[in-house]
Curated annotation (Swiss-Prot):
Disulfide bonds: none annotated. Belongs to the universal ribosomal protein uL24 family. One of its GO terms (cellular component) is ribonucleoprotein complex. GO terms for molecular function: rRNA binding. The keyword Nucleotidyltransferase does not apply. Part of the 50S ribosomal subunit. This is Large ribosomal subunit protein uL24. It comes from Proteus vulgaris. It comes from the Bacteria. The lineage of its organism: Bacteria, Pseudomonadati, Pseudomonadota, Gammaproteobacteria, Enterobacterales.
Amino acid sequence: FEDGKKVRFFKSNKETIK
């Protein structure tokens, strides 16, 4: 289960977009 990894990647992507 790579939920934490996915969430971490999503958060990083969101920061990059911001």
